[in-house]
């Protein structure tokens, strides 16, 4: 198993997903032994789904087992709701969401070789695409900075059982594992044994296919990453660059862009609709499970809905007082700028508010409408009415946040208020 270790576990926050079943019990035991030699100590994480009448007993078993091994255990209770999914898929979704919230650097899962074969066959039966058919990678990114690690993939269910017997390891059996109403169990107990009996080395053939598909997928991902890097090379998603690709590559680039921004990738039809609008229309807007996607001025913008709501902190109100105090109090950073406001202005009373239709700023000898300045900077129409503006006590505009100061008041190496949740326009 040493050959399966990811680089540099020392100092990493490592946890084993412990169900109490044979596989995870063996994995935790192995990692505790390896950790004593390698200088790292794994923790354990148990997800209490509440689906079995024995769920509390399983949690108690996991606690006792971890006490025996001398490792820490955290038990997390989740409420599983189907929401249009099967019970297995819904439980898996909740489980992985709980894993992600904990922010481990390395999360070790106990999937083994037989699980890999079952996963491939399930993807075949359900019509999965390349990513589904490639089954489970040994290591993959997870959460913001972590990885999921499956060190038991080279080993069979029998290998794991033999190890448990050799070391006298206890475990619990989930009664649902024998219920052939679940498709995975039908494959495990009926279909795969029959295929293995009829086709010599059937499991080996499946695993060879999985390895080949994983290599193809890795190559495809490399190409997509390079494509997306070029499309976003100017610091934003450039629709004109995206349009130079073939339809297939455009779809993959779009999917990768959404995934990289933390957006749940929609189904194929929804993805095709986004691609169609980007190709045919000048503007577009989509709500995607807690996110807003905006197409405007040849660019694609992503906003988290909760963040968009926060941007409305000045809507229908204005804040008066010492400018430095009210700006820092509202989360602004006072950054140095070649043509910013003088320090003494920030010590005076003023007003923080959103832009108004009549607002103008002196720019290079002429006065420009603030809203036209924002339009020229390709600011989304939805953001323009809530964009912050700094005015003096007489309500005359001094500076447009994140953008520029009025030339009549600006000095070299002055100060420009910048709010981190709004785009930077300079």
Swiss-Prot record:
GO cellular component: cytoplasm
Taxonomic superkingdom: Bacteria
GO biological process: tRNA modification
Gene3D superfamilies named among the record's database cross-references: 1.20.59.20, HUPs (3.40.50.620)
UniProtKB keywords: ATP-binding, Cytoplasm, Ligase, Nucleotide-binding, tRNA processing
Sites where the protein binds ATP: 19-24
GO MF annotation list: ATP binding; tRNA(Ile)-lysidine synthase activity
Domain comment (free text): The N-terminal region contains the highly conserved SGGXDS motif, predicted to be a P-loop motif involved in ATP binding.
Job of this protein: Ligates lysine onto the cytidine present at position 34 of the AUA codon-specific tRNA(Ile) that contains the anticodon CAU, in an ATP-dependent manner. Cytidine is converted to lysidine, thus changing the amino acid specificity of the tRNA from methionine to isoleucine.
The name this protein goes by in its record: tRNA(Ile)-lysidine synthase
Gene: tilS1
